[in-house]
Amino acid sequence: MAYKNASSPHQKQRRTTSQVMVLVILCLIPGVFLQSYFFGYANLIQISLACLAALASEAFILKIRNRPVLNTLKDASALLTAILLAISIPPLAPWWIVVIGTIFAIIFVKQIYGGLGQNIFNPAMAGYVLLLISFPVQMTSWLPVQSLQPFSLTLMDQINAIFTGSTLDGYSVAQLSVSIDGLSMATPLNTVRDALHNGFTVTEIFNSVQFKASSWQQIYWINGAFLAGGLILLFKRIVHWHIPMSFLLGIGIFSFIAFAYSPDLNAPPLFHLFSGATMLGAFFILSDPVSASTTVKGRILYALLIAFIVVIIRNVGGYPDAVAFAVLLGNMCVPLIDYYTQPKVYGGRK
């Protein structure tokens, strides 16, 4: 057997928490860039507001708990939570939406449970669910892509819309959510769900004007960008393959079963894989090492469970996308999954 000679030192240095968080944030850049390119720069404003709220709220609660403030803030975990939440909400949502969600995520989901490494729920998704349930109108006011927007929005228009609810010319967010053909803007998942409830088949929906105006091509590109960033995380071994690959495989299998059973009432697997927050969830949310399962078998079961819930809610639930709800339900099951998937210790009794 041939052995490879390598110079010392042979013990590799482990990455620090801050290095891991920063690398994850960097891998989010392709998806964030395409969001800005297709829908405007308002999402960057939301990210800035969320980061400020995250740092301020974490510093506040750390001060109350008599914990070191600067050293904790340097780990960048609060910034990652803020960015994940900010890119999940509509770009022109009121400024207080992202602030409330971020404060809730940092204080009530992360710090009250003991801080980084102790929270049982994913903070960003818990904050998102709080906002979606509490403010459904603001959380579903999506913009058309810039090529279909009836008004040309400058950066100042977007800033003004976020802080006052209207552009410099007086157009409200509701008016901005209507494309040039007069159709109210909705995500592809929204469009498919609403049309199915109205009795249309999947084939009719995909050929409809409403679906073609729902920016589905841009959403596919954005998911592809998050997939590219996720593959970098896999290559760097920041994320193990078990969770993202099992989740995507589960989405494909479960959606294929539903599509094969009733192709007129269920979207095909490719649509599910590249719509909504599928790729963002697979590589950046489910793979959270704190709230996910810790065993190899457990990670696979955890990801498959979430994939199953996502497909079920998308097909028959009341919400178009279900990644956030599915992740929180999966987080609840982690202790049980870990209990029954612990590897047998050599020499131990079964």
From Swiss-Prot:
User: Which prosthetic group or cofactor does it need?
Assistant: FMN
Q: Which gene encodes it?
A: rnfD
Main location class? membrane
- What is its quaternary makeup? The complex is composed of six subunits: RnfA, RnfB, RnfC, RnfD, RnfE and RnfG.
Record organism: Psychromonas ingrahamii (strain DSM 17664 / CCUG 51855 / 37)
Asked if the keyword Cell inner membrane belongs to this entry, the reply reads yes
Instruction: List localization entries.
Output: Cell inner membrane
Protein name per UniProt: Ion-translocating oxidoreductase complex subunit D
List where the protein spans the membrane: 20-40, 44-64, 68-88, 89-109, 125-145, 215-235, 241-261, 267-287, 300-320, 322-342
Query: What family name appears in the similarity comment?
Result: Belongs to the NqrB/RnfD family.
Role: Part of a membrane-bound complex that couples electron transfer with translocation of ions across the membrane.
Q: Which GO terms describe its biological process?
A: electron transport chain; transmembrane transport
